[in-house]
Amino acid sequence: METPLEKALTTMVTTFHKYSGREGSKLTLSRKELKELIKTELSLAEKMKESSIDNLMKSLDKNSDQEIDFKEYSVFLTTLCMAYNDFFLEDNK
């Protein structure tokens, strides 16, 4: 039986692969795929402007290949986890 943390990790990996490869490489997310992932999987997307998604793509795409690989996606998730933790800490003061 999977632990809650293992389920979370499985979800993060399967979510990446659910969107990657719809166009281009199965191992990367294009801008369009990243945008679709964000808009579908994250409630914060409702508040994001197109320019914010473009800026996010640029900041994540460390090798400047116009695609987000799994390592770059992992950095995105880590950043989100840190933001959620900050929110949690602030909310519990």
Curated annotation (Swiss-Prot):
The name on file for this protein is: Protein S100-A5
Membrane spanning stretches: none
UniProt feature coiled coil, ranges: none
Ligand binding (Ca(2+) 2)? D61, N63, D65, E67, E72
The organism that produces this protein has a lineage beginning with:
Eukaryota, Metazoa, Chordata, Craniata, Vertebrata
Gene designation per UniProt: S100a5
Keyword flag rRNA-binding? no
Q: What's this chain's function?
A: Binds calcium, zinc and copper. One subunit can simultaneously bind 2 calcium ions or 2 copper ions plus 1 zinc ion. Calcium and copper ions compete for the same binding sites.
Which positions fall inside the EF-hand domain? 12-47, 48-83
Q: How does it assemble?
A: Homodimer.
